[in-house]
Structures are given as structure tokens and as C-alpha cells.
């Protein structure tokens, strides 16, 4: 079975304001399969956001690889990587499109890179699918 997301020896090193290197991710390897429900826990500055940003492609790894559905996307631009994944923030109402519903955000993600056509009609046709996805996540976003 192919992992949906696979990180292998993922490392992210940054320089602070004094040219000192700080290791944010250190040789992280993980596999996420269909139907997995995972939680990433850690204190402030532990690397949770860095992990998600490297998977999404908004930050590059210093070393290691990222595969999505078996394809190495490590060097893909965020735009090219968006073909494979999107994310909705924990509180999407506070994110980059606060006036959009979670379902509207999911619709944009679903058709990224395609002509969108009649947005309300497409949204209505995927309403049940998106509602089921949102209910899996919970967190008060069901409505």
C-alpha cells in the first residue's frame, strides 16, 4: 500500500539573527496512509508549523524527501504541489479567506488549477462530500 504522504529523513535547518543554525526538524520520517487520523503535538516552537509548511511546499527542506501518493514532490513549487494537497487551517474563518465557508475553501482546493466555472453550482454538487469530510474533522466546523 502506498502512503498518501511520506517523509523520509526530513530535516529543516534555519539561521537565526546571529547566523547561528537551529535545527527545526531533525531527520523526521513518517508515513500517512488513507484512513489514518494523526495528531501532531508539541509546544510552542517545536516544529509543528514547520512540518506542515514543508509538506505544503511553502518551506523547503534542508535535506530529506517528501512523497505524495508515491511521487517525490520535494523540489516542486508550492503551486505544483497544490495539485496533490491543500490544507484548511484549524480555524479557517480566521485564515486567508475569512468570509468563505469551509466548504468553499474545500471547493477551491478540489479544483485548484482548473477552470472553476459556476462556483455556486459546483459547491452545491459537492455539498454532501464536503459535509462528510468536515464531520470527520469535527472541531465545531460542521455547520
Regions found by a protein language model. Name each.
Residues 28-39:
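Pre-Walker A (P-loop) beta-loop-beta motif of ABC nucleotide-binding domains
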Residues 39, 79-90, 94:
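ABC nucleotide-binding domain signature
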Residues 41-43:
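The feature captures the beta-strand-to-loop junction immediately N-terminal to the Walker
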Residues 56:
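Helix-to-loop junction immediately C-terminal to a conserved catalytic motif
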Residues 64-72:
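Conserved ABC transporter NBD signature motif
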Residues 72-86, 116-123:
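ABC ATPase NBD coupling module
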Residues 99-115:
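Q-loop/switch helix immediately C-terminal to the Walker
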Amino acid at each position: 500500500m502506498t502512503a498518501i504522504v511520506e517523509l523520509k529523513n526530513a530535516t529543516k535547518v534555519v539561521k537565526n539573527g546571529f547566523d547561528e543554525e537551529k535545527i527545526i526538524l531533525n531527520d523526521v520520517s513518517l508515513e500517512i496512509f488513507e484512513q489514518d487520523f494523526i495528531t501532531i503535538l508539541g509546544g510552542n516552537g517545536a516544529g509543528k508549523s514547520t512540518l506542515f509548511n514543508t509538506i505544503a511546499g511553502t518551506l523547503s527542506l534542508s535535506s530529506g524527501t517528501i512523497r505524495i501518493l508515491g511521487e517525490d514532490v520535494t523540489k516542486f513549487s508550492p503551486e505544483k504541489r497544490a495539485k496533490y494537497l491543500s490544507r484548511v487551517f484549524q480555524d479557517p474563518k480566521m485564515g486567508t479567506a475569512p468570509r468563505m465557508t469551509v466548504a468553499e475553501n474545500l471547493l477551491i482546493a478540489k479544483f485548484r488549477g482548473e477552470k472553476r466555472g459556476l462556483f455556486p453550482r459546483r459547491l452545491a454538487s459537492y455539498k454532501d462530500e464536503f459535509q462528510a469530510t468536515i464531520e470527520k474533522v469535527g472541531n465545531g466546523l460542521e455547520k
